[in-house]
Amino acid sequence: MNLIRAILLLIFLSTPLKANTIYNLIKIPNLEIYEINTKNKLRYFYAARPFQLGTQKNIVCSNPNKKDLELKYKIIHKNLNRYSYDYLKKINLKYIVMCENLSISELYTAGIPDNIMKTLILDIKFNEKYFERVIHHEVFHVMHLQHKNIFNEEEWAKFNNFEFKYAECSTCTKNISLEKYQETNGFFTEYSKSTASEDMAEVYSHMIFLEKKEINQIRKLDPILNNKISYIENKIKEIDNSFTY
C-alpha cells in the first residue's frame, strides 16, 4: 500500500511541477508539454487552461480542445520543420505555445512573438485560409525583434512610391485584409500597407509560402516587390548564409 501511495503522490505532483518548470522558462502560466522531441529542437507547449499575460493582464488566450490541437500541431510542425536548428538559434526561437482566441487588449491576433523568451505564441483558431502562411509571418517578427539593427524600416520605406506612407501602428489603420492581391503593385496584401514591419513580414511569409515559380513571376512583373524580396534575401544571408527558401 505504501508503494501505491508513493506512486500516486508522484503522479499527482508531476503535472504542476512540469507547469512550474515551463513557467520558469518562458513566464507563461498554465502550459503543458505537447512535443519536445523534434528534429530542429523546437519545444511545443499548449495551454491546459486559459492564461493572461502582461503587466495589465491584457494578453489573453484560451485552452484548445484536443481535436483542434492535434490537427493544428501537424500543420504548425510541418511549416516550422522547414527551419533548421541553426537558423532558429540565430533568430532566437525555441518555444512554441499553442492556444486559441489569442488577443491583446481585446484585439485578436494570429501570434505574439517574444525574442527575449525565445517564444512564439500561436492562435490555432486563426483564420484557416491564412493560417499556414501566417506562421511564417510571425517567425519573421521573432527574427525582426532579434535583429532590429539589420532590418532598417526607413530604408525599407524608400522602396515604395514617394506618395505612399505607412500608418503609425498596425492597429491604427483599416488595412487588415490578408488576402493576396491579384495585382500586387508593391504590396502582397492590404495588411502589408499598415506598417513597414508588417510589410516585411508579409513579404517574408509569401517568399516562404508561395511556389518559387510564382515568386519569380511576381518579381518580373512588380519592380517594387522585386526590390523588397531582394532586401529580405540579403538581410537573411547576414543572419544565416545557409538559409534557402
Regions from the language model: what does each represent?
Residues M1-T21:
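Classical Sec-dependent N-terminal signal peptides that target proteins to the secretory pathway
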Residues T15, K74, K78-N81, Y85, ...:
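Surface-exposed alpha-helical segments enriched in charged/polar residues
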Residues N20-D68, E100, T171-Y181, S197-D199, ...:
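Non-catalytic architectural context of zinc metalloproteases
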Residues K27, T38, A48-P50, T55, ...:
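Generic alpha-helical secondary structure signal
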Residues G54-I116:
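Auxiliary, metal-adjacent structural segments of Zn-dependent hydrolase domains
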Residues N92-Y245:
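Active-site-flanking segments in enzyme catalytic domains
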